[in-house]
Amino acid sequence: MAAPVSEPTVARQKLLALLGQVQTYVFQIELLRRCDPHIGRGNAPPTEAERASGAGAAASSEAGPGGPAGAFLTPLSVTLELLLEYAWREGERLLGSLETFATAGDVAVFFTETMGLARPCPYHQRVRLDTYGGTVHMELCFLHDVENFLKQLNYCHLITPSRGATALERVREFMVGAVGSGLIVPPELSDPSHPCAVCFEELCVTANQGATIAAAWRTVSVTTSPSRRRCGWTPTSVRRYLPHAAGLSDADRAGALRVGPCAGPDRGGRRAAPPVAENDSVRKEADALLEAHDVFQATTPGLYAISELRFWLASGDRAGQTTMDAFASNLTALARELQQETAAVAVELALFGRRAEHFDRAFGSHLAALDMVDALIIGGQATSPDDQIEALIRACYDHHLTTPLLRRLVSPEQCDEEALRRVLARMGAGAGGPKGGAGPDDDGDRVAVEEGARGLGAPGGGGEDEAPSPRARGTGPETWGDIATQAAADVRERRRLYADRLTKRSLASLGRCVREQRGELEKMLRVSVHGEVLPATFAAVANGFAARALLAALTAGAGTVIDNRSAPGVFDAHRFMRASLLRHQVDPALLPSITHRFFELVNGPLFDHSTHSFAQPPNTALYYSVENVGLLPHLKEELARFIMGAGGSGADWAVSEFQRFYCFDGISGITPTQRAAWRYIRELIIATTLFASVYRCGELELRRPDCSRPTSEGRYRYPPGVYLTYDSDCPLVAIVESAPDGCIGPRSVVVYDRDVFSILYSVLQHLAPRLPDGGHDGPP
């Protein structure tokens, strides 16, 4: 019997099913925006009740970044929420445009409204972030702008008040149009030269050949968010999908199947060019010699050389393509769009008796007036992005390989033809030699075969057919004529070797350039698909701010709430605890552990590698946090040594005044405020460490507000400890007692404070009855 499926799994499956349905609805909206408005008007519009229910569903998704009642967000819930709001908003706009078209009847006006041609670019969103160090203004224009802002907010979360969550609402508004429009990323939103956090994490685990992360980061191209996909079109799509189209009669369907691209083979495909016969007389002569030979005859080296050269010429696909064939192939590719349009019109006439006025047809004159680059980016109905990329690369190669040197290297059959001609000439000159014996030019035949097999010609000019010099044969004394002949041969050989090396280097440079440009073309032309990186990043940061508000709301309903912020007599407790702790210093053996605690508290909610199944230390998560925002090296060094620099000795670590812990009055600027927050957090860590050491009450846990995750019942458990809220109004919350299940309820005891030492004294008062010695004396 199979194990029962858990409730979270069932809920996730239902959300995925709903997400698929909403994605389909959004896709239909995008199609109707581009289709003939008569088609949209042909269907009955939704009733007012249906439209009201859609508005209610969208309104329920507008509870803000934290969701309804601060619900815990997931990438799936964020994506579904964005899709619902986009579907409702664009659906209402489309219905309004269809109603306007029913009155005016202007197709151009309909497409201008639905496609937003008269509206400004919707992908510009101003964002304002209020921090304790000042106000930051930014503009979101691209997807990487959203991710960068979320990572920066994650880094600055400890100096951002709870109202900083309002900035996430502006981010969400941008994501509704950018991510909620479906799986396909609008081309104007994606910039592959800005990698995401996942790309950086992958970069950190790959070999870098000694390069710094900053240097390697500049060469990374984004492949995860968004990711690029191959897509194509086949002329058999109509034949495959038309039989399943609803609302059509069998006669109309059969008539449509007899026309269009489904009526025959792909006429837009490339036609293989027939092999081109060159040097027919040489090949015929060689074939005649080979046909006259049989196994009962002795094989001469020259005949064997001819056979070997014919083998090299016959092996492989070396069929050339004439200029006219290439021109005809290009014309066929250019005509593919026209053929597709003609076939589509034929199918429409067969099915509906009229030619539909879609967006690309209504604005055909505008599309035809675009320049080559814009037309390349827009693409076509019958040409996939990969077809465009291959055509551009093929045209580039065809242009550059017209150079004789490159053509000779990439067309080795020319070398084989020349070698075959030389062998035949030598055999004709030595025809009077003894049959079956080795003629005087056997070495020359062997050299010719080797040159032909290697594709090595003599591009330097004439002289290739000359016999080896007497010095090369090692016969006879040298004469001035022999020396001149040898010098000329050496010049030709050096020229050949230089040309060969130059050709190979040029071809390698061309290949390297084409590979780089191919990558750029893939970035520009291939279809990009949204991943889960952006919704996951938004959910993590939003959950961090929602956790602050949730902790404040839950602790306010505890059974016992002690507010030291306005209680009398707290100053004496502050003086007593401060004086008792400053007399001690932290054990050096504890510095590594409290350093990791410091890294855990200053890190944001986005990078939580320390909570994974295969947990990593907190310094790893903080490393990803600071590297993704481009923190300068000197600040990273300062942050790494922040705890070690204090060491818990002396009074330098106690930086806050009474009831002014986490107070940033008089400090301006992000970096100075961030440094002040680090000092406050260091003070809290050292004070709690000394408190546990001096009073021997066990380790006092320091926790973040987002340390708790909802259970399957939606409840949050907060273990006892001191919670740093990052809110200057109430930065410290101590839960000294809670219910047995860990939830905050009537039995819980909570302490609010703005002072480290007074809240520690309150904790000591609560723990004193449990201590073996009853605790130390209180303040005088």
From Swiss-Prot:
Record GO biological process: viral DNA genome packaging
GO molecular function, a single term: metal ion binding
Residue span of region Disordered: 41-66, 428-447, 452-483
Pfam families: PRTP
Subcellular location(s) per record: Host nucleus
Domain of life: Viruses
Keywords for this protein: ATP-binding, Host nucleus, Late protein, Metal-binding, Nucleotide-binding, Viral genome packaging, Viral release from host cell
One cellular component (GO) term of this entry: host cell nucleus
Biased composition (Low complexity): 52-63
Start-end of Gly residues biased regions: 429-439
Residue numbers binding ATP: F691, A692, S693, V694, Y695, R696, C697, G698
Complexes and interactors: Associates with TRM2 and TRM3 to form the tripartite terminase complex. Interacts with portal protein.
Protein family (similarity comment): Belongs to the herpesviridae TRM1 protein family.
Its job: Component of the molecular motor that translocates viral genomic DNA in empty capsid during DNA packaging. Forms a tripartite terminase complex together with TRM2 and TRM3 in the host cytoplasm. Once the complex reaches the host nucleus, it interacts with the capsid portal vertex. This portal forms a ring in which genomic DNA is translocated into the capsid. TRM1 carries an endonuclease activity that plays an important role for the cleavage of concatemeric viral DNA into unit length genomes.
UniProt name for this protein: Tripartite terminase subunit 1
Phylogenetic classification of the source organism: Viruses, Duplodnaviria, Heunggongvirae, Peploviricota, Herviviricetes
Gene symbol of the encoding locus: TRM1
